[in-house]
Regions:
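Phosphate-handling catalytic interfaces
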Residues: 77-190
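Short, solvent-exposed loop/turn elements at beta->coil junctions and helix N-caps
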Residues: 31, 72, 91-93
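Residues at alpha-helix termini
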Residues: 32-33, 74, 175
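Short beta-edge/loop segments at beta->alpha junctions of small alpha/beta modules
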Residues: 1-70
């Protein structure tokens, strides 16, 4: 880990092996000394990276998208802090999760998975995350699981934004089959 830095992303043993055997042994020594932590097989992070509030989603769950509480927190739609990183994956996919940090997977069908995904830079990491409109639709869709108060907070926060896009919101609501319920929420708020 001493040599090349990978734009604040977690390091894989494959990347280090490309630099040579000596670099790989330095990585293993760093793990033994406690400067680097093994997240899961082949993925390593420094203690500074673990102290950060964001993780390298693509290193831990390749192809995963930040969703629900984690996405609401990043977009500033809720004041509650997530207890785990909520990551959406395509249904039927097998993923090995690390012990730390705590990750909750949410399997989603292929047709629903691609709706509203975008790339963002957060805490130096390039992350896949659902956009604000998709997040609002998810809050309405999972309102019984996350709680009505959290759902109302997300909808209210979105409606208070100056850059809200209601046409895109209703398009996503149609595709995610929550339009009728979302219209009821918005009718009460506006």
């Amino acid at each position: 880990m001493e040599g090349k830095r990978y734009s604040n992303s977690f390091t894989s043993s494959g990347m280090v092996k490309e630099e040579g055997r000596a670099a790989y042994y330095k990585l293993l020594d760093s793990v033994r000394e406690g400067d680097t932590v093994r997240i899961k097989r082949g993925v390593y992070a420094t203690t500074e990276q673990l102290a950060d509030t964001m993780i390298d989603v693509q290193a831990i769950v390749p192809g995963g998208v930040l969703c629900l509480f984690s996405a609401w927190n990043v977009h500033g739609l809720t004041t509650s802090l997530p207890q785990a990183y909520h990551i959406a994956v395509k249904r039927g996919r097998k993923v090995t999760l690390p012990v730390f940090p705590k990750v909750e997977l949410h399997p989603i069908t292929d047709t629903m998975f691609d709706i509203g995904g975008e790339d963002q830079i957060g805490s130096g990491y390039r992350i896949q995350i659902y956009n604000k409109e998709r997040c609002v639709c998810d809050a309405v869709k999972y309102r019984n699981k996350v709680g009505m108060d959290v759902c109302a907070e997300v909808v209210n926060s979105y409606l208070a934004l100056p850059d809200r896009n209601l046409s895109q919101l209703f398009d996503y609501a149609d595709r995610l089959r929550v339009r009728r319920i979302l219209e009821q929420y918005i009718a009460l708020k506006l």
